[in-house]
């Protein structure tokens, strides 16, 4: 793929339903590590950004040389906060980028396959789509 693509990993520190949810382990790795590994192993992204209000989460990203860590303010890191303000806050503070696409990798979707990511991005680019979203159907 010749396109420059950013992987944006939003990961809030506070969770009311499951404490430290994004740091929970599945096997030997936590959800942050799984998502970062998927982004890096896919070799799809020219830049991978971990955005969080939590120093503990950003510290996990520090283990990876190719990860850009971005601390977001508490005002956009609440239980009711959406992902879009975190993305806009990043770009407002980082004006030097040349990427053409942005892919949001939710930490709470650790079962994604790299092949699915590749197929998804390839499809979006080939169809010249401006927006794409993946969903999973619930089987009855």
For each predicted feature, which ranges?
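Conserved SAM-binding loop
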Residues: 24-25, 50, 104
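Conserved acidic residues
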Residues: 5-6, 46, 67, 100, ...
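Conserved N-terminal catalytic core of the sugar/cofactor nucleotidyltransferase
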Residues: 34-97
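N-terminal nucleotide-binding beta1-loop-alpha1 segment
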Residues: 1-19
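Short, well-formed alpha-helical segments that are part of the catalytic scaffolds
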Residues: 18-41
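Conserved core of the sugar-phosphate nucleotidyltransferase
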Residues: 80-86, 101, 107-140
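Glycine-rich phosphate-binding loop signature in dinucleotide/nucleotide-binding domains
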Residues: 2, 93-100, 125-127
């Amino acid at each position: 793929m010749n396109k420059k693509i950013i992987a944006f990993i939003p990961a809030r520190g506070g969770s009311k339903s499951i404490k430290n949810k994004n740091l929970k382990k599945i096997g030997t790795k936590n959800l942050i590590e799984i998502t970062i590994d998927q982004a890096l192993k896919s070799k799809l992204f020219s830049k991978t950004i971990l955005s969080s209000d939590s120093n503990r989460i950003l510290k996990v990203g520090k283990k990876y040389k190719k990860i850009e860590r971005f601390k977001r303010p508490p005002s956009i890191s609440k239980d009711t906060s959406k992902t879009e303000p975190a993305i806009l806050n990043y770009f407002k503070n980082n004006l030097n980028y040349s990427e053409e696409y942005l892919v949001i990798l939710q930490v709470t979707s650790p079962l994604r396959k790299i092949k699915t990511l590749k197929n998804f991005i390839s499809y979006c680019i080939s169809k010249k789509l401006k927006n794409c979203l993946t969903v999973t159907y619930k089987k009855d």
